[in-house]
Amino acid sequence: MKKALFVLNPASGRQNFWNEVEGIIGCLVLNGIINQVDVAYTKQRYDARAATASLRYGQYDFIVAVGGDGTVNDVVNGVIKSGSRIPLAILSVGLENSFADSLRLPSGKEDFCQMIKAFKTVAVDIGRINGQYFINTVAGGIGTDLSYRADGETKAVLGRKAYFLEGLKTLPLNRSLWQKKH
């Protein structure tokens, strides 16, 4: 039997996902896949990092990051800081889940439980810039700026369209290189 830590971002994109998470935890317990579950909730940025930064090898058999790419990024940074090398599973519930999507990770209850039961891990490359680790992509400029400008309430109402709306708002502020030269 395995021990799991679920790091859950309640402010993540699909905000009505707690029943889904409860169902997955129930499935894992009832099928004898895990016998201990701890849940760490995030309240603000970097909470997921803090929740995983002091973990020790063997403390958990795996961690489940429940959220979007930002939650996954914070968990990865915490696990690396801890040196625990605990395997990470991702349950996509955020607006942006490009890493989980690229790996075609399941998000439905039965498929997710089967993935955990099979416990086949995949090694991924980890990058580092300015002391920050990443497993997905590194970005800068307007794309990064938009993800920070879009507030949680707008994202909850509009979903991914919130990023588009923020992009429209910044158009008057962004001039092309051609315009700057002339």
Predicted feature residues:
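Hydrophobic packing residues within well-ordered alpha-helices of enzyme cores
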Residues: 24, 48, 75, 99-100, ...
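Catalytic core of DAGKc-family lipid kinases
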Residues: 31, 42, 81-182
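Short Gly/Thr/Asp-enriched flexible loops that form oxyanion-binding sites at enzyme active sites
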Residues: 71-83
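Short, glycine/acidic-enriched loop or turn micro-motifs at the edges of active sites
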Residues: 12, 72, 95
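Glycine-rich N-terminal segment of FAD-binding domains in flavoprotein oxidoreductases
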Residues: 62-70, 74, 88
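Glycine-rich beta-strand-to-loop/alpha-helix junction loops that act as flexible
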Residues: 10, 66-68, 91-93
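Short amphipathic alpha-helical segments
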Residues: 18-20, 76-79, 101-103
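ATP/NTP phosphate-donor binding region
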Residues: 1-63
